[in-house]
Amino acid sequence: MTSQKATLIGLVAIVLWSTMVGLIRGVSEGLGPVGGAAMIYSLSGLLLIFTVGLPDIRRFPGRYLIAGSVLFVSYEICLALSLGYAATRHQAIEVGMVNYLWPSLTILFAILFNGQKTNWLIVPGLLIALTGVCWVLGGENGLNPGEIISNVATSPLSYLLAFLGAFIWATYCTVTNKYARGFNGITVFVLLTAVALWLHYFLTPQPAMIFSLPVIAKLFTAALTLGFAYAAWNVGILHGNVTIMAVGSYFTPVMSSALAALLLSSPLSFSFWQGAVMVCVGSLLCWLATRRR
């Protein structure tokens, strides 16, 4: 496989991931936040067994296996439940934007814990990304503290999970980079996520799962999308141009919001798009801060 083809496949993964906010929310509306997520990750895990394969975890570095498992499962649960618990579809898209603080945080953590070299661009990058998220949360009024507080107060758990998830995923990326040694535990991690969600589903009171043709269609679409996205990303990382893929990933907030708005029939305000662009620009500046010499 050529590098160009592998890079293109990796970029397809970014587009696929961009649909997940809308798809996870759509499934959760029929099957519940926990039940819907459990179904998605169960089917995705089965798909990954056939696309990526089931690795021999006995060969994994211990720190990668333990830390990677805990962090990956925690992040995916935070993401899925933050979208499912959102009060409205529009709020689910906002929650997804909060989660996209992770690219900037990943670079910050790489600087703090992995010795990544940087320059002054990291400061405006982080500030712009954070401002963008606050701008989104302010609704039509943009950067309005009162409106932000009022908005978050309508579904505090949802926003808290998304914010926590951004930090967890940044930590996961840092740990993977430091301890993985070329091993890929994604199949195991997705299956563990499914197990954790099913335990939560059966051990706590949950709404009944109501299956309908639209919900089933969204469920299989979400599972296939998630499974193929991880498989495609793996091809890109192994054989493609990682730099191009990294730059492409920083435009995910805009793509994700556009696709979620389409899938959920939830139009977004001009102020929202301003905030989304800020998140992308801030993330790109953080990335450039580690590239300039």
UniProtKB/Swiss-Prot annotation:
SUPFAM superfamilies: Multidrug resistance efflux transporter EmrE. The keyword Zinc does not apply. The keyword Cell membrane applies. It comes from the Bacteria. Disruption phenotype: Mutants show increased sensitivity to methyl viologen. One of its GO terms (biological process) is amino acid transport. The chain crosses the membrane at residues 7-27, 34-54, 64-84, 93-113, 120-140, 148-168, 183-203, 208-228, 244-264, 268-288. Residues 28-33, 85-92, 141-147, 204-207, 265-267 are periplasmic. Residues 15-137, 167-285 form the EamA domain. One of its GO terms (cellular component) is plasma membrane. InterPro entries: Diverse_Substrate_Transporter, EamA_dom. Belongs to the drug/metabolite transporter (DMT) superfamily. Aromatic amino acid/paraquat exporter (ArAA/P-E) (TC 2.A.7.17) family. This is Aromatic amino acid exporter YddG. It comes from Salmonella typhimurium (strain 14028s / SGSC 2262).
